[in-house]
Amino acid sequence: MNNPYEKALDGLSIEDPVKSFFDWCIDRENIRVKREKGIPAPWTDDPIFQKGRFLNTFREDDRGSKAVQRFCAPLKDSLPDLVHALFFARWCNKDTTLDLLDPSILKQTKNLKEFLLNSVSQPWCSAVYPVVSMHWEGKVYERFEACTDLLPALIDFLVKCIKASDGNVVTATNMINSTFGMSNDFPIFMAVIGISWFDPET
């Protein structure tokens, strides 16, 4: 995959990286606020911000995270159902798909698979971060099968790990991935930390 920003900082000398980082955060957040108020572009005089695409300062302001919140909110009063929705949402991670799905379909595996393959624009999932294959009971599951066929059977295991972690997202992620064996555990981390949006005490 070609990364247009791969060499963007080559040769750049930053005198105070910490100050520069927080200045960037402030500038980027100001852009988001102006956009949300409907102020027309450009939202900054900085030519780099005008020409480039950048993440929001706060992840919860990203379109994908907002879609995850909307999708999971109806299930916030049931930890098992919330965990199911969060793990599916992070395996999918595509706002346009999540916005079309009713979370009640997660327990209807056949209907869910049919919907993902035939009722949403393809691809049904996002490649913003890799969701690699995972292991369960001696079998390897790729992304689609993992979040449709397998996920309903994993809920008790996931909830048990999350409760046993005593509120530590890194501990929960490591406990889960010690079984899943994923070479990139970021989707697990994102699903687990999403619980705090709805139930900060878990």
Q: What is the role of each PLM region?
A:
Residues 119-181:
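Helix-hairpin-helix/helix-loop-helix acidic hairpins
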